[in-house]
């Protein structure tokens, strides 16, 4: 039965998100001094600590974190919660490893995307274009999973159809992302992160009330499924699963492009430090808390999986329906829908930047043409809208098991970008040949093993992908580094198109700045000096 009471909180939330996107866009237009591209794709590098932390958390915490993960915890037990605890490290590692270096490098280069940095460091259009392609492919897979998860949850709780849910929240997220750009996405992410926390608290209260309190729930679980109390769940949580999931959703998430680009958008080191500390606490409470609720729901949903539709993705929707009155259920689903929205909006912006900044604008710069801001604005918004529409169409026929789709995309992005980004920022001897071999070889190995179901010692295929990518990165770079250094020594000044050059002619200087969306800057003698300065650079 259709429920207006369950629908109303969702509509109110979406309306607030849209209003925030519009206001953020107008503020950005007034405050921006770096052109449309810098404003639309990285918010003119102006994020404060709270917004920085919340936009990163909301981007990382997808609908899988609220639906698929807790559903698995209902099936496995507290072992899944112990595995999820590694997500506490996500922001700490991201900001600690990438935060300062990426901010310094991107400011000196005038870079607004991860691909900009890769292109400048390795002097390779092929590598940059391949990076953009991989981003779009894996981001699209992730976005489909978010659309499906959000629409399924909406349908289950409100009683409206799956397609109606897809139209309402899918249409809303595409519209406000198109309007708001990076700044709008960042501010709506802060709203989404807050909504996720509220949703967790409401659901926790509902589960504890319906189950007769924490002690009664634990007694029920102990009586019905004693193995759920054990770390290894009598074989359901082998050590190999712990190890590989810790790599996949914890340690190596620092290299996900959608998270790394946040390191280009913050205002100063104070924002970075405060975001690191507060964000680590919030993401820990959020990810451990919502996964633990999945386990506790086994004290309320005591039947077998077939009774709940045969999929773990149905567990949290069923828990919300059975534990909460309709109006509170509407508030509770705002949390996971916010998780879906925040992830989709961030991935849409990153995918749009791959087309506009990394492919189209770069090609125009190669041909000596500048593109007016008005044209860039229209094109960026049209691409964002078109990508959202394509993902929407793909989500109409929903795939099953959302968390598996999400983990596949995580693994592909980590394999492709981990060693390429680390080599770019921290290893002088990394070469474009090594980066190409790493990205191509590692990604192909990962995808082939996933398709064939091939594992080594029961470990997830991410281990194979990362290992192959690492060996190729180091081996090929060492073989080609001497030649690369010799070539570098012949360069008097960098010829990277990512870096706006200081040109004596005023009209050319203005055109270059307009095309890149940044102010003209004086270029050092070598891009290597930007990435590996003799004296440590200071970010104020």
Describe the predicted segments one by one:
Residues 1-540:
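Membrane-embedded helix-loop-helix hairpins and adjacent transmembrane boundary segments
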């Amino acid at each position: 039965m259709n429920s207006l009471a369950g629908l109303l909180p969702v509509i109110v939330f979406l309306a607030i998100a849209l209003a925030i996107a519009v206001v953020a866009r107008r503020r950005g237009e007034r405050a921006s001094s770096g052109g449309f591209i810098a404003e639309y794709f990285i918010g003119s590098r102006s994020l404060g600590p709270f917004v920085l932390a919340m936009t990163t958390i909301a981007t990382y915490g997808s609908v899988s974190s609220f639906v698929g993960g807790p559903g698995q915890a209902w099936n496995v037990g507290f072992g899944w919660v112990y595995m999820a605890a590694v997500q506490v490290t996500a922001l700490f590692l991201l900001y600690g490893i990438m935060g300062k270096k990426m901010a310094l490098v991107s400011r000196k280069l005038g870079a607004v995307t991860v691909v900009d940095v890769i292109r400048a460091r390795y002097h390779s259009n092929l590598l940059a274009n391949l990076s953009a392609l991989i981003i779009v492919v894996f981001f699209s897979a992730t976005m489909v999973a978010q659309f499906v998860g959000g629409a399924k949850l909406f349908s289950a709780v409100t009683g409206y159809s799956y397609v109606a849910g897809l139209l309402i929240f899918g249409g809303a997220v595409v519209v406000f992302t198109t309007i708001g750009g990076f700044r709008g996405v960042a501010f709506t992410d802060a709203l989404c992160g807050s909504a996720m926390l509220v949703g967790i608290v409401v659901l926790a209260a509902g589960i504890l009330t319906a189950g007769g309190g924490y002690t009664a729930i634990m007694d029920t679980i102990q009586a019905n499924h004693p193995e759920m109390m054990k770390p290894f769940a009598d074989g359901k949580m082998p050590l190999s699963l712990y190890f590989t999931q810790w790599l996949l959703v914890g340690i190596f998430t620092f290299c996900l492009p959608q998270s790394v680009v946040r390191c280009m958008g913050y205002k100063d080191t104070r924002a970075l430090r405060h975001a690191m500390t507060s964000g680590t606490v919030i993401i820990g409470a959020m990810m451990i808390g919502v996964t633990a609720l999945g386990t506790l729901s086994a004290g309320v949903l005591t039947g077998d999986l077939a009774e709940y539709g045969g999929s773990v993705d149905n567990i949290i929707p069923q828990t919300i329906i059975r534990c909460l009155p309709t109006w509170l259920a509407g508030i509770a689903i705002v949390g996971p829908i916010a998780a879906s929205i925040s992830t989709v909006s961030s991935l849409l912006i990153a995918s749009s930047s791959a087309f506009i900044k990394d492919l189209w604008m770069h090609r125009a710069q190669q041909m000596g043409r500048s593109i007016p801001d008005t044209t860039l604005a229209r094109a960026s918004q049209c691409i964002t809208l078109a990508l959202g529409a394509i993902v929407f169409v793909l989500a109409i026929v929903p795939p099953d098991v959302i968390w598996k789709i999400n983990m596949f995309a995580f693994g592909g992005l980590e394999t492709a970008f981990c060693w390429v980004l680390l080599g770019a920022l921290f290893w002088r001897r990394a070469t474009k040949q090594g980066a190409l071999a790493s990205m191509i070889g590692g990604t192909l190995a990962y995808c082939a093993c996933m398709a064939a179901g091939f594992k080594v010692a029961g470990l997830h295929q991410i281990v194979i992908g990362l290992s192959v990518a690492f060996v190729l990165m180091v081996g090929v770079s060492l073989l080609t580094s001497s030649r690369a250094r010799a070539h570098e020594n012949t360069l008097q000044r960098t010829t990277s198109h990512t870096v706006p050059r200081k040109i004596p002619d005023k009209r050319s200087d203005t055109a270059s700045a307009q095309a890149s969306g940044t102010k003209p800057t004086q270029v050092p003698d070598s891009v290597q000096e930007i990435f590996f300065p003799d004296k440590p650079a200071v970010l104020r």
